[in-house]
């Protein structure tokens, strides 16, 4: 275990093993990959049972970036910085440099012994914890705000923002909760009902092709949810200026990039979705965070453009 692989066509190619057999401070071999994250064009990873942050250098080579003194649970990016969550109460931020002297402790969360998961929601970093399955939100003044507990669960596992809403998986019942605001979480269902086990996990999560996905343990199944309708572009935009168009027609949502269709929702009956509301229209700021880039020549139409009209607009 502990290997990382990349997909080339229809075959998997080894990218080596994080940390080799044993790090200088590791009590066990690095035999399990716990999390991977891309930061500033480089791939970083952490192991499950040992300390240390590792950076991929190409081929089968990994650099051991060191340890701040405790095991890490996961890592993620927010506002241009890499963050790691520890087997403890801390959240750490890394901005530059080659060693752990550049890491800044951002939090010591009360009553928390593991900071397990991370997401970006409404412009803030949010983290999930053990042993009370609470979610905390980072505020601009540096404070951490308790967003409530997920039922009677013990740990918040995978978290994702899907169709403008924050979802989180749990342990020990393998449930998925939806955040409804003001500290209130609603259980959307139990994904793992394996009998005669102590812990069931809704562990990993992703948004793909307009749906929310969760992986479960010990059942080993992948479950999906479609709430409302959405169309998602599941790859990064190419560098430079891109022409984007989002169109809602009578029964379909369509996303275009440079005049070409790149995503479509499943079909729906328009009458089932009354979107009238009193909320302000926000451009360049969504349910994740602010857009990092530049926007020009914004146009809003009163009707749905046809595909040929989008192509003409894209030039």
PLM features per residue range, with description:
Residues 1-32, 38, 42, 48-73, ...:
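Trp- and S/T/G-rich repeat-edge/linker motifs of beta-rich repeat architectures
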Residues 6, 37, 255, 259:
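Short aromatic-centered micro-motifs
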Residues 28, 77, 86, 130, ...:
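A generic fold-level signal
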Residues 47, 86, 129, 170, ...:
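Glycine-rich, histidine-containing beta strand-loop boundary motifs that form or position
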Residues 160, 184, 227-315:
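Extracellular glycan-associated modules
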């Amino acid at each position: 275990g502990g290997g990382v692989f990349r997909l080339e066509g229809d075959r998997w190619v080894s990218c080596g093993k994080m940390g080799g057999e044993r790090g200088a401070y590791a009590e066990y071999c690095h035999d399990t990959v716990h999390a991977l994250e891309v930061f500033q064009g480089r791939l970083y990873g952490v192991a499950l049972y040992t300390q240390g942050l590792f950076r991929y250098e190409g081929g089968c080579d990994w650099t051991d970036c060191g340890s701040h003194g405790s095991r890490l649970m996961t890592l993620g990016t927010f506002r241009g910085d890499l963050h790691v969550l520890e087997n403890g109460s801390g959240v750490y931020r890394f901005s530059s440099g080659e060693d752990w002297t550049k890491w800044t402790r951002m939090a010591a969360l009360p009553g928390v012994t593991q900071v397990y998961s991370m997401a970006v929601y409404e412009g803030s970093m949010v983290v999930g914890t053990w042993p009370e399955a609470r979610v905390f939100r980072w505020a601009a003044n540096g404070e951490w705000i308790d967003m409530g507990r997920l039922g009677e669960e013990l740990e918040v596992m995978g978290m994702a923002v899907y169709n403008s809403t924050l979802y989180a998986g749990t342990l020990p019942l393998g449930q998925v909760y939806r955040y409804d605001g003001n500290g209130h979480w609603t259980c959307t269902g139990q994904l793992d009902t394996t009998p005669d086990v102590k812990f069931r996990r809704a562990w990993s999560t992703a948004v793909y092709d307009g749906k929310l996905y969760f992986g479960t343990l010990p059942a080993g199944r992948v479950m999906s949810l479609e709430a409302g309708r959405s169309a998602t572009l599941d790859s990064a935009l190419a560098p430079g200026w891109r022409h984007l168009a989002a169109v809602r027609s009578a029964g379909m949502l369509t996303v275009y990039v440079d005049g070409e269709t790149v995503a479509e929702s499943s079909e729906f009956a328009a009458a089932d979705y009354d979107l009238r509301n009193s909320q302000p229209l926000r451009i360049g700021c969504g349910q994740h965070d602010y857009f990092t880039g530049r926007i020009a020549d914004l146009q809003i139409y009163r009707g749905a453009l046809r595909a040929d009209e989008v192509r003409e607009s894209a030039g």
